[in-house]
Amino acid sequence: MENKNLLSIGKIVNTFGIKGAVKIALEKSIEVNDINGIKLLFIENTNNVIIPKQVESISMQKSHLVVYFKEHNHINEVEIFKGKKVKYLNDNDAFSIFYDLTYYSVVYNKQNGKVIETMFNGNHDLVKVLLENEEKAFWVPLVDVYTNNIDDESRIITLKNIEGLK
């Protein structure tokens, strides 16, 4: 399994109980969509080798996953996994990535800017934008009327038709 096909979901922070469960702290940008769809996790060891582990049972406790692996039945068998990264082949959308838009840049008619605040109004996400050489920030709904493109890799939002919003 190639590392690039795997989604990094968190890190094993501790063991849980004496029967070999581990506690996984999820990354802040990761959201669990279908906990029952998680059947296989991958642990990255210190040599960057990916080790597949079958999930026997899994539950959510606050912002942590508690996972029992099929081949491990005692705390001593899972102690070695503490501090290791956990990855998942997200082929069934059990996890989704939540992007924090406050770290995005904005482009509008060759004018650069930045997102300074975000909000959800019940229907749409909105971003408060401050463009270069302008003193006043304004809200932009992230809908097709006002957005050309939202590039999550480069973290750039390209806007259009926003003159009436300023």
UniProtKB/Swiss-Prot annotation:
Q: Which InterPro entries match?
A: RimM, RimM_N, RimM_N_sf, Transl_B-barrel_sf
Q: Where in the cell is it found?
A: Cytoplasm
Does this UniProt record's set of keywords contain GTP-binding?
no
| Chaperone listed as a keyword | yes
Which GO cellular component terms are attached?
cytoplasm; ribosome
Keyword list (alphabetical) reads: Chaperone, Cytoplasm, Ribosome biogenesis, rRNA processing
Report the residue ranges that make up the PRC barrel domain in this protein.
90-165
User: GO MF terms on file?
Assistant: ribosome binding
- Gene Ontology biological process: ribosomal small subunit biogenesis; rRNA processing
Its domain of life reads: Bacteria
PANTHER family from the entry? RIBOSOME MATURATION FACTOR RIMM
Q: Which family does the similarity line name? A: Belongs to the RimM family.
Q: What does this protein do?
A: An accessory protein needed during the final step in the assembly of 30S ribosomal subunit, possibly for assembly of the head region. Essential for efficient processing of 16S rRNA. May be needed both before and after RbfA during the maturation of 16S rRNA. It has affinity for free ribosomal 30S subunits but not for 70S ribosomes.
Describe the protein's quaternary organization and the partners it interacts with. Answer: Binds ribosomal protein uS19.
Let me see what the UniProt entry remarks about domains.
The PRC barrel domain binds ribosomal protein uS19.
Protein name (Swiss-Prot/TrEMBL)? Ribosome maturation factor RimM
Q: Which organism is it from?
A: Mesoplasma florum (strain ATCC 33453 / NBRC 100688 / NCTC 11704 / L1)
